[in-house]
């Protein structure tokens, strides 16, 4: 049987995304109600990039599902060096029930998935952060109810993985997504096109703008992320100057709907992309969002493994 993979947000149809989110809500209420990895059965969790939330949430989640996480960093494997990714995928598929990988280029994940006979999950790539988006959607649903028809605004680096996932995952849920970013930091055109194609089937929309204030006006959800993503620290680009107008602060929050919520996938650079006042304020659901990485990823693993068996 060909495995189902989760490499980007639109790998799930709208109905499938809703199934995963419903299961995530159930698992949050009863963490041990699903045990698809009882045995324990193994899951490979591979890291080319450092992580806090991803590592803890996957390790704890796999244990709660009855399994054992085999956690390996890039220094400890031959991934893409002395052995091809395809050969590694074939071997790991004989050992584990799924492969979770936090890496750089999206094509590395695609190469792994192309040869694997077990599900491959994108735990973050340069292009997408789909597990985080599931957690975001779960948090939004908890605080806003139905997702369809909500208005969500992302402020900051529109070219980063969270902006891409917010577009694809958001419109899959029927959310109207606006990306507010300065010139030179807009989303990749191919991902904008993919999001708009998906939006045609859900009634959602994708809007791109350079006007942060106009983008924030009246929205239900405000989202931001770091201005400098992992691996960009030494690229020499001046990000603070163009991004200051996109800082998520009390002024921008005041433009949104009075019941609007604020999301940040963390880690946050307080005083840069988000102020302390907003991060710790009444609109923030950041900690619920972070917790939901555990529940959403457990639901995703369970859903994928059910289809594998």
Swiss-Prot record:
Record SUPFAM superfamilies: Aspartate/ornithine carbamoyltransferase
Similarity comment text for this entry: Belongs to the aspartate/ornithine carbamoyltransferase superfamily. OTCase family.
Classification via PROSITE patterns: CARBAMOYLTRANSFERASE
Entry coiled-coil feature ranges: none
Any one biological process term the GO annotation gives: L-arginine biosynthetic process
UniProt entry keywords in alphabetical sequence: Amino-acid biosynthesis, Arginine biosynthesis, Cytoplasm, Transferase
Catalytic activities: carbamoyl phosphate + L-ornithine = L-citrulline + phosphate + H(+)
Leader peptide range in chain numbering: none
InterPro entries linked to this entry: Asp/Orn_carbamoyltranf_P-bd, Asp/Orn_carbamoylTrfase, Asp/Orn_carbamoylTrfase_sf, Asp_carbamoyltransf_Asp/Orn-bd, Orn/put_carbamltrans, OTCase_ArgI
Protein name: Ornithine carbamoyltransferase
The protein's role, per its UniProt record: Reversibly catalyzes the transfer of the carbamoyl group from carbamoyl phosphate (CP) to the N(epsilon) atom of ornithine (ORN) to produce L-citrulline.
Transmembrane segments: none
Upper lineage: Bacteria, Bacillati, Actinomycetota, Actinomycetes, Mycobacteriales
MF (Gene Ontology): amino acid binding; ornithine carbamoyltransferase activity
Binding-site residues for L-ornithine, renumbered to this chain: 161, 225, 229-230
Top-rank EC class of the record's enzyme: transferase
Main localization (coarse): cytoplasm
GO cellular component terms attached to this protein's record: cytoplasm
Binding site for carbamoyl phosphate: 51-54, 78, 102, 129-132, 265-266, 293
